[in-house]
């Protein structure tokens, strides 16, 4: 059996587009991503505001698209793909993180899975008796659950960033499938999140023509992610067709032992869904970069108030008195609390920690992205030798953020699955 391959490269704004093309080919993506199938670029939006390390970067999305076009993939068969969560506004997020700029520049389709005429089918209709092998999803959803019909037969390229997570220690390729494959009741799986990620990988392997991941570590996030992190500039890119292996290598870079510290990696490794042992993974590209240890402290040393409460609800003393409410029409209280805490309180009060990052070359490239974008037909320019003079900015206006978060709060309450289900029953 051949070894799993993970490509690792150092990068800079001056070479990032060429680096993404080289990275993907080092990882053998053309052997995995079929040219005669639709290809979904699964964008990661962990926060609808720009925060370094939290979401798919514009140069990551742009680099992958240009690599695909350079290698002969038909742009009309490539689309960006977004899910919706009850606390994140995907439309705001794709604008604030400048992903929409990239998609529109290339003229690609932009699919929001929960909108328009998108069809969903029962998971058993898609995977058959494979569902009998699920570790936990049959218990979480005894009546089954729905997945997007369009995913069946499509390629998918995941676009995560390197960061920590308060539920899973790290998050990356495997976790990026969470929003796309599960509906808005995905929070029901949080108590068994590691087993859930393994079940979702089983589903992906059955329904997709090809599964590939391209991970951006230009910014990397430490601390109680995926939002409230301490970002660092790391200038590293990863790619692999093995979703377990790329998460293992990213975890090792951050300073974790993937088989010891990441239950979802260990479970997937033991089930032969991928390789989670770094000693058995073939690294191609920049071997020195792959040997780095960033000594991240992880998500649990300095948890936010919100993340501490989440742990108490899902795994601690509040599980019995509170968790049941998250599966009823009372659940929107948790969505409201999350939006108010993260958007109105944490974000405006913790911006000094990213000051240096915003002044980095990547921060300046982000700030100047609109005027720096290359023509969609330019597949030769390697990157941006001059990323621009001015640093990126976070939104500092407390009152405006508060007002915007109220708008997001209103949307999440209207679209909460518990409320929308009751509304559908009344109008049926």
Task: Label every PLM stretch briefly.
Residues 1-428:
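N-terminal and secondary-structure boundary signal
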């Amino acid at each position: 059996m051949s070894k799993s391959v993970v490509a690792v490269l150092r990068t800079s704004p001056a070479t990032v587009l060429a680096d993404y093309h080289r990275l993907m080919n080092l990882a053998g993506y053309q052997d995995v991503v079929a040219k005669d199938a639709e290809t979904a670029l699964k964008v990661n939006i962990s926060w609808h505001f720009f925060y370094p390390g939290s979401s798919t970067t514009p140069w990551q999305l742009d680099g992958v698209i240009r690599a695909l076009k350079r290698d002969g993939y038909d742009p009309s068969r490539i689309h960006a793909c977004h899910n919706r969560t009850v606390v994140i506004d995907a439309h705001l997020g794709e604008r604030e993180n400048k992903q929409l700029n990239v998609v529109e520049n290339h003229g690609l389709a932009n699919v929001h899975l929960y909108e328009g005429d998108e069809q969903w089918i029962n998971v058993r209709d898609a995977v058959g008796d494979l569902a009998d092998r699920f570790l936990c999803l049959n218990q979480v959803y005894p009546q089954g659950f729905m997945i997007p019909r369009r995913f069946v037969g499509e390629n998918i390229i995941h676009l995560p960033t390197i960061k920590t997570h308060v539920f899973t220690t790290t998050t990356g390729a495997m976790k990026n499938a969470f929003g796309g494959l599960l509906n808005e009741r995905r929070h029901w799986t949080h108590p068994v999140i590691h087993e859930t990620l393994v079940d979702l990988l089983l589903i992906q392997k059955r329904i997709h023509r090809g599964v590939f991941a391209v991970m951006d570590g230009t910014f990397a996030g430490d601390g109680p992610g995926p939002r409230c992190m301490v970002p660092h500039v790391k200038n590293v890119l990863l790619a692999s067709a093995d979703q377990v292996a790329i998460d293992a290598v990213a975890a090792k870079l951050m300073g974790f032992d993937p088989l010891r510290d990441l239950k979802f990696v260990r479970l997937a490794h033991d089930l032969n869904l991928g390789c989670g042992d770094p000693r058995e993974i073939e690294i191609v590209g920049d071997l020195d970069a792959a040997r780095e240890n960033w000594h991240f402290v992880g998500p649990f040393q300095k948890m936010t108030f919100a993340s501490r409460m989440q742990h108490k609800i899902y795994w601690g003393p509040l599980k019995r008195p509170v968790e049941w409410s998250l599966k009823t029409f009372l659940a929107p209280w948790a969505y409201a609390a999350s939006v108010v805490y993260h958007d109105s309180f944490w974000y405006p009060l913790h911006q000094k920690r990213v000051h240096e990052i915003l002044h980095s070359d990547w921060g300046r490239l982000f700030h100047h992205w609109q005027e720096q974008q290359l023509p969609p037909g330019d597949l030769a320019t390697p990157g941006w030798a001059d990323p621009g003079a001015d640093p990126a900015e976070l939104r500092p206006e407390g009152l405006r953020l508060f007002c915007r978060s109220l708008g997001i709060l209103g949307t999440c309450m209207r679209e909460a699955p518990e409320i929308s289900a009751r509304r559908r029953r009344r109008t049926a």
